[in-house]
Amino acid sequence: MTENPFHYLVETLSGTSDKTFFNVSKLKATEYDSLPYCIRVVLEAVVRNCDGVLVKEQDAFNILNWKTKCEFKEIPFLPARVMLQDFTGIPAMVDFAAMRDAISKFGKDPKQVNPACPTDLIADHSLQLDFTKCIAAQNVSGLPAVETHRPTTTPGKTPGRKAQCRSQGGCKGACDLGAANGSSREQIENTPMLCPFHLQPIAEPETALKSLEIEFNRNKERLQFFKWCSKAFQNVAVIPPETGTVHQVNLEFLSRVVMEEKGCIYPDSVLGTDSHTTMVNGLGILGLGVGGIESEAAMLGVPITLTLPEVVGCELTGTINPIATSIDVVLSITKHLKQAGVAGTFVEFFGNGVSQLSVADRTTIANMCPEYGATVAFFPVDSVTLQHLKQTGVDLQCVKTFENYLKAVKLLRQENVQQPLYSKVLQINLNSIVPYVSGPKRPQDRISVMDMKKDFETCLKEKTGLKGFQIPEEKQNIMVPVTYGNSEYSLSHGCVVIAAVTSCTNNCNPSVMLTAGLLAKKAVEAGLTVKPYIKTSLSPGSGTVTYYLSASGVLPYLSKLGFDIIGYGCARCVGNTNPLPESIVTAIKEGELVACGVFSGNKHFEGNRCSCVCANYLASPPLVVAYALAGTVNIDLQTEPLGENAQGKKIFLQDIWPSREEVLEVEETLVIPSMFSELKLKIEKQNTRWNLLDAPESTLFPWDLRSTYIRSPPFFHKLEKIPPPIQPIERAYVLLYLGDSVTTDHMSPAGSIPRTSPAAKYLMQKNLVPREFNSYGARRGNDAVMTRGTFANMKLFNKLVGKTGPKTIHLPSGQTMDVFDAAELYQRSEIPLIIIAGKKYGLGNSRDWAAKGPFLLGVRVVIAESYEKIHKDHLVGMGIAPLQFLSGENAETLGLSGKEQYSLSLPVDLTPGHKVEIKTNTGKIFHVIAAFDNEAEVTLYKHGGILSYVARKYL
């Protein structure tokens, strides 16, 4: 291996004898001191990983000259670790398992095949709300202390006991708690509910346990594979369900701030397969949300490519308003940055206001980074960060080592040192921030709580659009009577029917959650209640939240108002929710009401919750509770009461809102090192379901040929020890002739599997019925399903066919058929395929199967006017050549019909930007550009893609 050209920067850390580091601050001190902190982290990674092949010496100097090279230079980046959630983790780990098989066939030790960096896989996105619970407690003052240990009863088999259901008579008699066990099949089929408010009447604390039991049963096959991965591979850790959301677990348990490998210490950084991986930016860790292929590349030791970004400095000044929560700060910053236009940039926070924000506040702000369009929202490590590490149980000597290292490489933010230079600077005065909500259709549409009533009434009148609902004037004050249980209610525009404290965005923040809990306590003590038809829930980011809500004594009060813990994964945050009561839905539809949902999550786009709830608002957890108490968003919380108690006394929000001092006192008492260490111990030792789950004890995975979820992919079937020379493509047919702005969702849809699709036909051949199809996203570990789903989007427009639909023409026969069926016929005849497209080919979310699928269909070349860069990189990563029409040319100007046959040759000495000649069987000749950006991409292409490139290293 080539010696690292920066080896002269290696030093021993002061105060230690066995810890070394690359002192990048000495590379070019003047230039280094002017770099933003987030760029310094990138520079350190390039210096440490410089091998002269995939990471070159010049890359480091390009970063040092960041201000002049910005947006013009691409640099390689290898993270300290990779984080996967279950949906994206499946295909990545399936590829690793298949690579082991391939290595074994060459007589090599398959145990060599392991991720090149620590990889954590968190199974959190499969949680669905199969159960919520009936409120058994009627007198909160008499409730016993809430236990944090697991019940000793068998999951799902609680002793039956009678208690009044919160539906107030909607059940057929009193709920027989725990009597009905249900099954995963019954829940999947969405059978009628025994109780209008619940899918099953079930007692707390069994609510979360019951949903988790079904989660394990529903996903048993995938979980068994994950468990095998955790045993078979080095550098792989699996965090099972029942733990928390991917980002909360990352923050509480996986983040290191400073990493160590073989005595070398370096900054923590992470690539995660979710846009909200940025949450750990609040802890001073560079976290980037990427797609499946980028994360898999990093796991394989191949760097991803970053364009040197603009870095926007966001200066926070002033002090936080006493009644404003961190969520108010988040929403204010979201709107400010959205308006300032920071899309695609790195945002770095500085100024005297930063020190007023706790790590929980910072991570909440960083979590919302994708909502204002930035790639990164970075808070450099400072004294607040170090104090947080001590508070959460990190060994004090480790914290001291971290501090010494970060000071040595100038990664510790201090007030008395030179400020970095930024591309531009924005200022936000924290004094000006007051409580806000966001909605009713987009997260960037922020409304002051004081203006909420006026704004909602305006939305009713405005034309249908970004905010308006265009309700006729004569219908704006309509009242719809509804019977729910044994009581009569009236619904009107603005009625709240869903109120959910959910998602990692808020649940990580003790002050915000404790404010909600203390507000609930004061509300109950004041005699307020929540109307029983409102679907309320509490979905904590992790068990940490349960711990401090329980220990503070507020959990019973939240439960009294209906905010019951229903599980620890992504539930209502990703739309996994059970339906509203039928009578409420009917009333909403009959009255054409603008019904509302209030959430403390990070997204609320239209249609993401319930179809009959057309106004959705993001709010802080205490405001979610407040609006649930009011029962409407059409209220002035300053001047109108939330409700009346049994004595007829009007109760206003200011009567029950806890002071910042109250919240701080509880937070300082509870957020202690033992809390985090206890939860870490629970994860490691006490997950009974995971511990009892059977998994193979083998180096190679024993593939089950009957499985419809996990299948060995064919990516290595033609693997040779030496990569064969680039072969000419002769007489290729066009599989698809596409236009502009073809998205990755057109290429590989992630939603439900249509009954008439090739994927459905395959699953039916496996004796599955439509209700068992699940989604393309859930079956990413089965290449047979995903290949059949490639270009199966109903909105695809193929010019060969001339109309919308997932069809193409098999040109030799002239027959119109499904894209997969045509590709299969071509492959049987060993005919290569190409795709012709227009501008911006590959728009949309990063999606691994948008490149893997075309490769398995037999596509070897894409010719487009322009590409979305990430997707183009994915094509290269799968061994598909991205070719680009010359400027001013496209298929139409060249007179191409798409029905020709195409022949071309890429030279052995292929270079980025090489001009390639293409001939058609009609005699037409034209030229295109080989759209490779650098020599590393050419190398990967010559190997047939990333997977083959890495596999050959083991041969």
Curated annotation (Swiss-Prot):
PROSITE patterns in the cross-refs: ACONITASE_1 (PS00450)
Residues annotated for [4Fe-4S] cluster binding in this entry: 504, 570, 573
SUPFAM superfamilies: Aconitase iron-sulfur domain, LeuD/IlvD-like
Cytoplasm as UniProt keyword: yes
Principal subcellular localisation of the protein: cytoplasm
One MF term in the entry's GO annotations: 4 iron, 4 sulfur cluster binding
One Pfam family recorded for the sequence: Aconitase
Localization terms from the record: Cytoplasm
Domain of life: Eukaryota
Cofactor requirement: [4Fe-4S] cluster
Cofactor: binding details: Binds 1 [4Fe-4S] cluster per subunit. [4Fe-4S]-binding affects RNA-binding activity, thereby inhibiting activity of the protein.
GO cellular component, one term: cytosol
Family to which the UniProt record says this protein belongs: Belongs to the aconitase/IPM isomerase family.
Protein name: Iron-responsive element-binding protein 2
